[in-house]
UniProtKB/Swiss-Prot annotation:
Belongs to the UPF0178 family. It comes from the Bacteria. It holds the Pfam family DUF188. It comes from Staphylococcus epidermidis (strain ATCC 12228 / FDA PCI 1200). This is UPF0178 protein SE_0451. InterPro entries: UPF0178.
């Protein structure tokens, strides 16, 4: 069965890593972006970019529609990850963490608590900047996954 990597691509810092690591593997890459992130950059043959409307969650809905059981999905959106855990081969964060049924609920709970703080006018610490170490961790985890398929 054919494997695709589907990337929630509007703000994903590992797009180029995925493209490089999948070259010559027979794995296809689909990058989903909203039209506000349109680019005319030419991609390799194994890469396809799908643009969707700019509406809230439009990219997420399209990913859910396209994803199938042998796919790898890369997203930082915990809500999207929770919808896909039982649908695809692997759902992973761009820092290399794998979403599982045993860790997604605590991530969703933390997201909810942070939203409550923001609604009350409070602030919370955001994620740290993406580093070279994060990229290397992602690439290592991603290589392991594509070598298993």
């Amino acid at each position: 069965m054919k494997t695709n990597v589907i990337i929630d691509g509007d703000a994903c810092p590992v797009v180029n890593s995925v493209i490089e690591l999948t070259k010559g593997t027979g794995i296809f890459v689909t990058i989903l972006r909203s039209f506000s992130h349109f680019s005319q950059q030419i991609q390799p043959e194994h890469v396809k970019i799908v643009y969707v409307d700019d509406g809230p969650d439009a990219v997420d809905y399209k990913i859910v529609e396209l994803a199938s059981n042998n796919d790898i999905v890369i997203t930082q959106d915990y809500g999207l990850a929770s919808l896909l855990i039982d649908k695809v081969h692997t759902v992973m964060h761009h820092k290399g963490n794998i979403y599982h049924s045993n860790n997604i609920q605590s991530l969703l709970d933390q997201r909810y608590l942070n939203a409550q703080i923001r609604r009350r006018g409070g602030r919370h610490k955001g994620p740290p900047p993406f580093t070279t170490e994060d990229r290397l961790k992602f690439e290592h985890a991603f290589r392991k996954i594509i070598n298993q398929i």
